[in-house]
Amino acid sequence: MHRRITGKLVIATHNPGKLAEMKELLAPYGIEAVSAGELGLSEPDETGNDFRSNAAIKAIAAAHASKLPSFADDSGIVVDALDGAPGIYSARWAGPTKDFTAAMTRIERLLQERGATAPDKRKAHFVSALCVAWPDDHLEEVEARVDGTLVWPPRGTAGFGYDPMFRPDGHTRTFGEMTSIEKHGLPPLGLALSHRARAFVKLAEICLEPR
């Protein structure tokens, strides 16, 4: 049986960009959100083989440490011409300093080396797996994706991560050029475009009630 989120919720991330997006998505539901960083929680090793298992690892670790329901996202970009890379290693490609400019440059260099210059050779998709874990090990898990094409040079300064080089299908602008409302569909969430917002819509249907 599904379980509703009430009261305080730990957001199990130390990524400022991801934290801001999650708080924005949670805002209509009146949830008191506190980050793992604010609580001084350490980051667990992400040893899973896919996005869903890594999200669960982070949520469970935060729930056990904080004794509170904890919400985690594991997301990344999957590039067809790079055999699915960077995938679950998307954050690691940015290194310890979270240098996504360098990570995007690395992707572009690899695409050029493989001759992937035409739009149909530059297909990619973002994946977001969301997990809410309770201290008693109850889990609620969802996953979503958004397909698109990689552009170069990167465009826009909104969002974070690989957003400036990802143009979602059916649009002329990158995520980096879109406002939060355009990217997340806020409000209403039913218009969600991004992978994280689409996953959040699924999670909200089973775990959240608007205030």
UniProtKB/Swiss-Prot annotation:
Substrate binds at residues 13-18, 75, 160-163, 183, 195-196. Keywords: Hydrolase, Magnesium, Metal-binding, Nucleotide metabolism, Nucleotide-binding. Its EC number is 3.6.1.66. GO terms for biological process: nucleoside triphosphate catabolic process; nucleotide metabolic process; purine nucleoside triphosphate catabolic process. The keyword Magnesium applies. Mg(2+) binds at residues 45, 74. One of its GO terms (cellular component) is cytoplasm. Homodimer. This is dITP/XTP pyrophosphatase. It comes from Bradyrhizobium diazoefficiens (strain JCM 10833 / BCRC 13528 / IAM 13628 / NBRC 14792 / USDA 110).
